[in-house]
A protein has these predicted regions:
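N-terminal small/glycine-rich loop or linker at the start of catalytic domains
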Residues: 4-23, 81-94, 117, 122
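Alpha-helix N-cap and loop-to-helix initiation/capping positions
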Residues: 24-31, 56-60, 64, 93-101, ...
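A short acidic, helix-capping loop that chelates divalent metal ions and anchors anionic groups
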Residues: 50-54, 87-93, 187-192, 298-301
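N-terminal binding-site loop/beta-alpha segment at the start of enzyme catalytic domains
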Residues: 1-77, 144, 223
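Active-site groove signature of glycoside hydrolases
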Residues: 110-131
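Short, well-ordered coil/turn segments that N-cap beta-strands
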Residues: 8-13, 40-42, 74-78, 115-119, ...
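Beta/alpha (TIM)-barrel catalytic core signal, keyed to glycine-rich beta->alpha loops juxtaposed to Asp/Glu
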Residues: 126, 130-323
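Short, acidic/polar
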Residues: 24-36, 97-113, 162-166
């Protein structure tokens, strides 16, 4: 499980809020958060950079989430996570994990959220120009200042995570508690040619998480709709034309996995999307899928995945480990 400096344990499914308050208006955003909380959810994920790609969107996610938390008086009842250290969108080669950059991002995030601390602070990207010691020291200091309770990494390689863990242990500093990366039942390769890639679960990374039981917080856990209603109808018709959703995931292996997911779902009387999420919850290490939606019904559907107990035979049929 995630080890937090808190008595609150995060719910197994996390709510992502990337375009809340921007493309997803305030009313719809609040309705989704209400439904998530009503279903037992308490783990919220946002980021300093979110919606910077939209006109007047930068900061809207953190502000909208913060307003909802204050309105409902829930700050001490939830796990609040945000991310910083993301490169400028027009200069993705630029590392931003220096002490002054993290200080700036964190301060602005706390101000937008209207809180004194966050439970988890993720570094949105690595900064290979910085030693892991410098990064570990920076985040450890913010924990000592009670501005964050724990920290994690997002889109880091296993090698750099191992280096940070070893450094923190060696010098009695605070280690990262989890890795946030792309992970769903559908495989997707990391674009290693990208200057600062979004990293996706692969067989080697999966093996490391299995060996160490290091927790994974999984973005794109629903593969941008690849296991949704539209794609299931498309699969039942024999895959005519392009995939209605999740086209970046489409391929022979994922189509086979989609068909098996549909079969398991039909046998159980649940949805393929619920089965796909349940697979992540049945891994040999802790996985906390992040869901992202603007529809209340999708939140309720996703949260029910926690009640599905898959058998070893079903997991084998689904080939639920990343591509070998």
């Amino acid at each position: 499980v995630l080890t937090l400096n808190s008595t609150i344990q995060p719910s197994r499914i996390c709510l992502g809020t990337a375009e809340f308050g921007s493309r997803i208006d305030r009313r719809a955003s609040w309705a989704v958060m209400d439904a998530y909380a009503e279903a037992g959810g308490n783990f919220f994920d946002t980021a300093h950079i979110y919606a910077a790609w939209l006109p007047n969107g930068w900061g809207a996610s953190e502000r909208t989430l913060g307003e909802w938390i204050r309105e409902n008086g829930l700050r001490d009842k939830l796990v609040l996570a945000t991310k910083g250290g993301h490169p400028p969108l027009d200069k993705m080669t630029m590392g931003r994990c220096g002490p002054e950059m993290i200080e700036s991002d964190l301060s602005e995030s706390l101000d937008r959220l209207g809180v004194e601390y966050v439970d988890i602070y993720w570094l949105h990207r690595d900064d290979r120009e910085r030693t892991v010691s410098e990064i570990v020291d920076t985040l450890s200091d913010h924990i000592l200042q009670s501005r964050i309770k724990a920290w994690g990494v997002s889109n880091w390689t296993v090698a750099r995570i191992c280096a940070a863990l070893a450094d923190a242990r060696k010098r009695s500093r605070v280690p990262p508690i989890a890795s946030q990366l792309g992970y769903s039942l559908a495989d997707r390769p990391t674009d290693e040619a990208s200057p600062s890639p979004m990293r996706y679960m692969d067989s080697e990374t999966h093996a490391w998480h299995t060996q160490t039981r290091f927790p994974s917080v999984a973005y794109s856990s629903q593969a941008t709709g690849y296991f949704g209603i539209a794609n299931c109808a498309w699969a039942r018709k024999g895959f005519p034309g392009d995939a209605p959703a999740g086209r970046s995931y489409d391929g022979t292996e994922n189509r086979a996995r989609l068909l098996q997911t549909i079969k398991v779902a039909d046998e159980r009387g649940v949805t393929a999307n619920q089965v796909a999420l349940a697979c992540l919850l049945h891994q040999p290490f802790p996985v906390y899928p992040i869901i992202g939606t603007h529809q209340v019904r999708h939140v309720r559907e996703a949260m029910q995945a926690t009640m599905i107990s898959l058998t070893a035979e079903e997991m084998h049929r689904l080939n639920a480990n990343p591509a070998q």
